[in-house]
Amino acid sequence: MDISIISDRNNPLLQRREIKFTVSFDAATPSIKDVKMKLVAVLNANKQVLVVDTLDQIFGKLEAEGYAKIYNDEKAMATIETKSVLEKNKIEEEAEAEVAEE
């Protein structure tokens, strides 16, 4: 899975960075959690304040376009983001421990 950043914009009014990106992959479309962890590594960001808002498959290609936001702090994120977006970006600690062991 390869991620390329299309745009990276700072939005001081909402206390966040807004990132548009494309994801190239070989098989099925990766999950939001997989894309989030890859973005954390590529952007050197804190996983607690990074939110993948959308991930849309490009018809006929093994690519997807996405939109992510990196907030300055968790308080700003909780104030602005909806509960559904926060739930789909939630990462359980047990899952991370399993990945770290492998």
Swiss-Prot record:
Keywords: Ribonucleoprotein, Ribosomal protein. InterPro entries: Nucleotide-bd_a/b_plait_sf, Ribosomal_eS24, Ribosomal_eS24_CS, Ribosomal_uL23/eL15/eS24_sf. GO terms for cellular component: ribonucleoprotein complex; ribosome. One of its GO terms (molecular function) is structural constituent of ribosome. One of its GO terms (biological process) is translation. It holds the Pfam family Ribosomal_S24e. The keyword Aminoacyl-tRNA synthetase does not apply. The keyword Protein transport does not apply. Belongs to the eukaryotic ribosomal protein eS24 family. This is Small ribosomal subunit protein eS24. It comes from Methanococcus maripaludis (strain DSM 14266 / JCM 13030 / NBRC 101832 / S2 / LL). The gene is rps24e.
